[in-house]
A protein has these predicted regions:
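Amphipathic alpha-helical segments of tetratricopeptide repeats
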Residues: 1, 30-41, 70-80, 112-123, ...
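Residue signature of alpha-solenoid helical repeat architecture, marking inter-repeat boundaries
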Residues: 3, 39, 43, 83-85, ...
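Tandem amphipathic alpha-helical repeat scaffolds
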Residues: 4-21, 44-61, 86-102, 126-142, ...
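Intrinsically disordered or compositionally simple regulatory linkers and C-terminal tails
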Residues: 191, 298-337
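TPR/TPR-like (Sel1-like) alpha-helical repeat modules
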Residues: 267-285, 294, 307, 321
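Helix-turn-helix DNA-binding segment
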Residues: 318-379, 383-394
């Protein structure tokens, strides 16, 4: 097969992939992987493995995706491609899968190696995907600075490389918004959601916008509007079931369980979680649950009590405990008033100027600043502003 033919096949697979037409995309990607194991087609082969692995994960076939990447590693070693820039695709895919399996240290090594190779080869797709995955992994580890630096690197590169918008990449802006939500910066996440809604307008539910919709569902739950989140998730669940995207379905059901729980609809919450556990257990999904934090842990305890996939729920609760023992704690979210004060501090306002701006007593401003210091674990204005920037608060 010629290189032009392989490139056309890969691009056609991407077109199907972005439309959510996984069956034809999968066939084309496997054709590329099968025929492309020669030096001239190396980049096509490794990028096809990356795409196929992501597709398999979305379908819920986590173990098959991992085997595909492990086979890819053997191919890379056999062909002497391990230092080739295109091998970065494979390493980023492995890092993503190992992260879901909660092997965070190995995941970080693969992601960092993939990013390095992407830089060496000047491939923005590898670098963007690697940084987005690394940002979320650093968040999982409680490394706020590392998470901020990684997502900032991804966003900067997306801004400079217009072509990246036409390649299947993890959406950097969605992950930035997820980080804001996790850190309690709902104002920034809300601004992102408003801009996203204006850019898209009214649209049918599609796989292309799935990450955005799931992020908005998380935001709605965090804002205390679980009913709106439930409505959004209902449409997403219908589409995912119809398309056989069981990996996506696990995440959606987990969020649906949280939305039900927030409305005190405990039986429905437990049923949604039980379905998610049923789909997840054979494949070993872990971080999809852990990433939702304490609320999902509470539901997992309920699953144990009611004997709904209790064995797997206990495994996940054990993983929660182990993560809590090793990860750095994230700071307590700032109140809206504390955020206002921090942003004025970052703008160079004195205590008196802040008091004038917000119609507060200077003593009240000092109290808010001390609360900010305590929550961010800092001791000065300079440190508070720096920490706030790391968290995307200012």
């Amino acid at each position: 097969e010629t290189l032009p033919h392989a490139m056309v096949t890969t691009n056609l697979a991407i077109t199907h992939y972005l439309r959510g037409a996984f069956a034809p995309a999968s066939r084309l990607l496997m054709d590329t992987i099968t025929i492309g194991q020669t030096g001239s087609l190396m980049a096509n082969t490794l990028s096809a493995i990356y795409l196929k692995a992501h597709l398999l994960r979305a379908q819920g076939a986590l173990r098959m995706a991992l085997k595909l990447c492990q086979d890819g590693l053997r191919l890379v070693e056999q062909r002497g491609w391990h230092d080739a820039p295109a091998a970065g695709f494979l390493y980023v895919a492995l890092g993503d899968l190992l992260g879901e399996l909660n092997d965070l240290s190995a995941a970080a090594e693969y992601l960092e190696r993939g990013i390095d190779l992407g830089h060496e080869g000047g491939d923005p797709h590898i670098v963007i995907a690697g940084h987005v995955r690394l940002s979320w992994l650093r968040h999982r580890q409680g490394d706020v600075r590392g998470s901020h630096e990684a997502i900032r690197a991804a966003l900067d590169l997306v801004e400079r490389d217009a072509g990246s918008r036409f390649w299947p990449l993890p959406p950097a802006d969605c992950y930035q918004a997820r980080l804001w939500i996790a850190h309690g910066n709902l104002a920034a996440a809300s601004r992102w959601a408003e801009v996203t809604h204006r850019a898209r307008g009214d649209h049918p539910i599609t796989y292309l916008h799935e990450a955005e919709d799931l992020t908005i569902a998380r935001l709605l739950i965090a804002q205390g509007d679980p009913g709106a989140a439930e409505t959004l998730l209902h449409g997403l669940l219908t589409a995912a079931r119809s398309d056989g995207r069981y990996g996506s379905l696990i995440e959606m059901l987990t969020l649906q369980a949280l939305a039900f729980a927030a409305q005190h609809r405990d039986d429905e919450a437990l049923s949604a979680l039980a379905e998610a556990l049923e789909l997840a257990e054979p494949e070993g999904f872990v971080r999809t649950f852990l990433d939702e934090g304490a609320p999902i842990a509470e539901l997992l305890r309920s699953a144990v009590v009611h004997d709904r996939h209790a064995s797997y729920a206990l495994q996940l609760l054990k993983a929660f405990d182990e993560s809590a023992a090793t990860e750095q704690p994230l700071p307590e979210p700032l109140s809206d008033r504390e955020l206002e004060v921090l942003r004025l501090v970052a703008a160079g306002y004195s205590n008196q100027a802040i008091a004038n701006e917000l119609f507060l007593a200077v003593s009240t401003v000092k109290k808010h600043i001390n609360h900010v210091y305590a929550k961010l674990a800092v001791t000065s204005r300079t440190q508070a502003v720096a920490r706030g920037r790391e968290l995307g608060l200012v």
